[in-house]
């Protein structure tokens, strides 16, 4: 709390996460929330659950790669790969199109185990 009290933040949304590590070491690189920049927007992701073999069975095909070893960060990179084509114009994509990609992602990870996630794209949570 001291960190927050002593700093000035310019944001309407804050995401925090307390991790019970089930995959990957307890290190800074595996700490939630994960953040990546895409089209001048900060995309943020936190996840609870266990995704089984998701990170072994799925492939990352874009520029987003995990820094750590957690299934959560891998799944975030997978989601960003899927969303990237919508953000290529440099403007915020249509919300319905973004939600369609996110819904398909949620359906896919659901087949690997119980999980929930929080995702913000710099426009909506």
List each model region and its residues:
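Conserved short alpha-helical segments that host acidic/polar catalytic motifs at enzyme active sites
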Residues: 1-47, 51-125
């Amino acid at each position: 709390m001291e960190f927050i009290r002593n700093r000035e933040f310019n944001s309407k949304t804050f995401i925090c996460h307390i991790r019970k590590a089930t995959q990957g070491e307890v290190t800074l690189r595996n700490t939630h929330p994960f953040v990546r920049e895409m089209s001048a927007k900060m995309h943020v992701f936190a996840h609870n659950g266990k995704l089984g073999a998701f990170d072994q069975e799925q492939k990352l095909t874009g520029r987003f790669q995990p820094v750590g070893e957690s299934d959560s960060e891998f799944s975030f990179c997978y989601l960003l790969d899927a969303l990237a084509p919508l953000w290529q114009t440099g403007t915020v994509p249509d919300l319905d199109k973004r939600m369609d990609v996110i819904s398909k992602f949620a359906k896919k990870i659901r087949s690997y185990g119980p999980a929930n996630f929080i995702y913000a794209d710099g426009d909506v949570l």
